[in-house]
């Protein structure tokens, strides 16, 4: 994007009082030259670049994220002869990926498709979709947070919830993306599927539910491979044709692009790294200097970092309980290895261009750029590849046995699924590992870049209070590193990146960040008592809570009791923020309950301490209407804690188990029960 330039054209007013012309002849001449020069520059900059002859691939589907000025998906469908539109609600990219795969497969069934972001479309046009022959709307919708729609599906969700439109004649299907460890499993997809039927729409195929805690990829391919026959039967279409390799983007190598026009890691705006300007968000992150990066663990072989980021001058604001998102970069050695395996010159400047000229999503990531930049900043190279990637990689195998192995793992056969589970998932193989082990598979690097998902920001609970640290954000992060069954050492992308970001003297070390607001909040009345359950790094948001309550006490305000249940392995190894916690206890701000699971013969966890303190917990949440918070592991700890709370409410509150469950749901509705958990 060329920077805008302005010319100060204010003329000096003559000091005399006569009726002289506002602009003299010389002024007019100079102005004409300036205007002419500006017009020449503008027209020249708008000229299309000449494209080298190296470009290839075809694509019958489009990713259509229409602009605000052209948000009619109906017009696009009609203009391009399409009848299938796949909407997605996605927070991390998986929903969008599934939508793209469905639209791409539609060509096999004579249904030309496009992918659409509901946030960028006029969703009231769903009423008109029935006017297109054999039309079908598919919704791939993730449930996010506390049973909420994703950011980009929020307006559609509100519209379908509050509206009372007649959707008779609309053919639809829904696939949901959720996680069974969370209470509101696939709530959004379940509701939308039911609501569309209530509004008169025709369900072409049953609701599909994907569980990210198990194998969402298997859930999706099992659903879609039953979905397509149902669609064919509904529309009277013959079965699918032969599967062919279809490329969505064509390669354009651009060796002559000026260096200042090449993306070097910017998320959206070119030169946004060098020229920072607010507001800062997911598309325009702030480069935050790291002020402190220190180790919290005292021993034990594991690492936990305390990081302090400066947000001074960013105009970003946060509250205790919010999240900070960081954009990591991939390990240089992995990037180099992938380049070698694909026989690529990583410093080649290129663009991947959508073959559908009607699509407003011209590139899968910022282009033009280099392969090195794309693999470092834009693509997820350490993730476990999904089956559709294996299917396309198989076409580049020269060894038939290796080709068959990849094809088998991409199939829906029981043997193929079992092989995918053991060889890919259990072995934690990423794209680099696969190409290392499948030695005859050497795909072109541009196709690899097309196939890999976008590198997503990593979210961390902020472990500080803006009352005490208004221009700093604190982060508490455990370094992820483990040995796989193949003997390789896998490392977490973000924590490895952060571990190496050590401030050195006067030289600033920066990371791109933005703030994400949360519903995880302290009570509006400081005198309200609270219970916090946060083992390990689950302590992070509660450190911010306690800082804030200490700050209020120091100001002379009345603050309710703050009870923290914290757990770790050993007091001598991973008791993080020990001195701070002990100091708050001494000052009377904190009532600390600590469980050290491996400091005695029988393991003790926070769950055990909660059971022992049944009277205290009932007093806080039952008799004094206090707030209850959980932060940490969703799959085990959070479930156990909730079950214990149900038991305490039943015994101490004289409730049935069903009433106790309803009591917790009522607390959730009142924002008195909050969870910040992950799996």
From Swiss-Prot:
Per the UniProt record, the source organism is Drosophila melanogaster (Fruit fly)
| Cofactor(s) the protein requires to work | FAD; FMN
- Similarity comment text for this entry: Belongs to the NADPH--cytochrome P450 reductase family. In the N-terminal section; belongs to the flavodoxin family.
Q: How does the entry describe its membrane topology? A: Single-pass membrane protein
Q: Per UniProt, which keywords does this protein have?
A: Endoplasmic reticulum, FAD, Flavoprotein, FMN, Membrane, NADP, Oxidoreductase, Transmembrane, Transmembrane helix
| Protein name, UniProt field | NADPH--cytochrome P450 reductase
Topological domains on the Cytoplasmic side lie at: 43-679
User: Could you say which residues bind FAD here?
Assistant: 458-461, 476-478, 482, 492-495, 678
Tissue-level expression: High in antennae.
